[in-house]
From Swiss-Prot:
This protein is involved in the repair of mismatches in DNA. It is required for dam-dependent methyl-directed DNA mismatch repair. May act as a 'molecular matchmaker', a protein that promotes the formation of a stable complex between two or more DNA-binding proteins in an ATP-dependent manner without itself being part of a final effector complex. One of its GO terms (molecular function) is ATP-dependent DNA damage sensor activity. It comes from Sinorhizobium fredii (strain NBRC 101917 / NGR234). SUPFAM superfamilies: ATPase domain of HSP90 chaperone/DNA topoisomerase II/histidine kinase, DNA mismatch repair protein MutL, Ribosomal protein S5 domain 2-like. Pfam families: DNA_mis_repair (PF01119), HATPase_c_3 (PF13589), MutL_C (PF08676). The gene is mutL. It comes from the Bacteria. This is DNA mismatch repair protein MutL. Keywords: DNA damage, DNA repair. GO terms for biological process: mismatch repair. Gene3D superfamilies: 3.30.230.10, Histidine kinase-like ATPase, C-terminal domain, MutL, C-terminal domain, dimerisation subdomain, MutL, C-terminal domain, regulatory subdomain. The keyword Cell membrane does not apply. InterPro entries: DNA_mismatch_repair_CS, DNA_mismatch_repair_MutL, DNA_mismatch_S5_2-like, HATPase_C_sf, MutL/Mlh/PMS, MutL/Mlh/Pms-like, MutL_C, MutL_C_dimsub. The lineage of its organism: Bacteria, Pseudomonadati, Pseudomonadota, Alphaproteobacteria, Hyphomicrobiales.
Amino acid sequence: MAIKQLSETLINQIAAGEVIERPASAAKELIENALDAGATRIEVATAGGGKTLLRVTDNGNGMSPADLELAIRRHCTSKIDDTLTDIRTLGFRGEALPSIGSVARLSITTRTAGAREGAAISVIGGKTESVRPSPANVGTVVEVRDLFFATPARLKFMKTEKAEAAAISEVVRRMAIAFPKVRFVVSGSDRSTLEFPATGDDRLARMAQVLGKDFRDNAIGIDAEREEARLSGFAGVPTFNRGNSLQQYAFVNGRPVQDKLILSAIRAAYAETIPQGRYPVAVLSIALDPALVDVNVHPAKSDVRFRDPGLIRGLIIGAIREALSRGGDRAATTGAQGMMRSFRPEAYRAEPHRAQAPWTAATSPYRPMRFDEPARGFAEAPQAAFQEFAQPAARPAETAPNGTVEPAFPLGAARAQLHENYIVAQTEEGLVIVDQHAAHERLVFEAMRTALHSRPVPAQALLIPEIVDLAEDDCDRLMAHAEEFLRLGLSIERFGPGAIAVRETPAMLGEMDASGLVRQLADELAEWDTANGLAGRLDYLAATMACHGSVRSGRRMRPEEMNALLRQMEATPGSGQCNHGRPTYIELKLADIERLFGRS
């Protein structure tokens, strides 16, 4: 068969196969055009998940009749001239409108501010009609009907109406985060109306609209710069995490992207604070010279290529970690909200037909606990593993004469210990409940990691070495990492076939189950990624040791020990979550407590 030139319609349909994969792809291209035209209000209407109808209305600059005629031609654009190294707009290829027109029924109505009347044009399955006069408001209305009617095979690959409508909503959410000064509305017969009023320069307010107010309450601001690149945005505290990565948003020069480099950098930044299988919530915006990033590497423009990827990755990881460190001991507020929802006041209401006897102190079987007296059952001496945090310098929080807590202590003053596992502390604004094991585990981990940067962790020799019987493979794996264990204060050596002798353990862990620790380390080494760097391996081992050497559940603590733990939490970055990403404390505001009792 001889080589021949394809028809313009077929060329556009081929391009549509790459650019317009589904209704959400068309919505993205049309919204980008509206934003490039300077719109401050964009309305999206859909039916049938965008397959039956997709209409995008904006109040942008509009087009003249001459520009409108060119707009539906392939590779006609006003956004670039003769180079791809200085792209400052969302669109630039001039492919979207002709591609959509080749597979759907496309109509465009537009008017510029200086024109007396508007202009309209239609393209049906690649066949273009002439430009005609039409009444119109300033701006542009692009209406797409019967998407893919000209290529019915594509319809077989469409998802359900609900799924396609949800994909369009997600496109609008990403655009809304990137452009807080623009009002977005999505409506239609296939959905509930979604509206994002403009928030001006308040980017966090727009993020609260899109991600919910929980994100606003649990976000830490990011603003960092390295060489030619600047990173801004917000990152959620580690305990505010999700079961998927759908709430990780990245933007490069205002363009929404789903770039693997950026997403992997986010994961790396949270690697030590979020458990496996959970994902952080973050909104990051990177601004840099357009010449330093190539946005023309993907048909949908969802991926980019940085000239210096190492710079971008380092900037993201460093900025997020610095922000989390600045966040200090913050834990997610959603824990307290979940606890509030678990209460069901109606279950405690008195039955109306049953007379209630008047309450008196004499007839009540309960007695209020006096917090000015030592609680019965507290240990007389601190646990060895806790002595580092129960020093005289870390004295209990003092209270003012009226009983209020000194504002210098955000986590308040310890008032009681519940079930020998939870510390209850009174704060200025309510109360805090601390998981003593999770909190101390994090403190020990941070102490070990800090010690590693300057010197090996101090060790304590066992009077009698502990012999641990293991499989030969486990012994080999443990001895292969003996040097790393030694830096962490754990000294092991071979003790004949199938046995390991533990001679020293980390001093800061006090008395501990050395045999249990060695067995757990052997199990974890069997599943370890050997490609991990030394720093990553040491952190992982330190986390395991910290778990074994922390204050255990069921251990009674004295008031000074509890207060010392609270003070150390306040002074330790990242103490709001344990090494597994779970919260170490939950805070209840006084207003929350009053709501539980029906107080206004």
